[in-house]
């Protein structure tokens, strides 16, 4: 299956997850609700979904004010469901971030 990516960082993330044998999905039918800075209801398509972890991953290299606002709103609405990676170094260490995140929210 061919999966289109929007950036080289997303390609790096997919390769890293594959190397770690972590199953991931990239599905445009997955839409996350948020409100933009004007209070308008919008939908956002996350970069990756990790079914095993019930976690969305957003790979963000460049931040606009609108993107910052969107991700802040998304994280407030879904506090245990998102992992945002902002550098190639964070992508390379995603296994540590996933472990820390899943341990933090285990009940």
Question: Predicted segments — roles?
Answer:
Residues 1-107:
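Electrostatic, structured charged patches in enzyme active sites and in nucleic-acid/phosphate-binding
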């Amino acid at each position: 299956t061919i999966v289109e990516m929007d950036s080289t960082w997303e390609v790096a993330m997919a390769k890293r997850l594959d190397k770690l044998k972590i199953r991931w999905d990239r599905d445009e039918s997955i839409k996350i609700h948020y409100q933009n800075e004007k209070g308008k209801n919008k939908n956002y398509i996350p970069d990756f979904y990790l079914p095993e972890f019930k976690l969305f991953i957003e790979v963000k290299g460049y931040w606009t004010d609108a993107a910052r606002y969107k991700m802040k709103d998304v994280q407030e609405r879904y506090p245990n469901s998102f992992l945002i990676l902002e550098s190639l170094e964070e992508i390379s260490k995603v296994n540590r971030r996933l472990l820390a995140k899943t341990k933090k929210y285990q009940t």
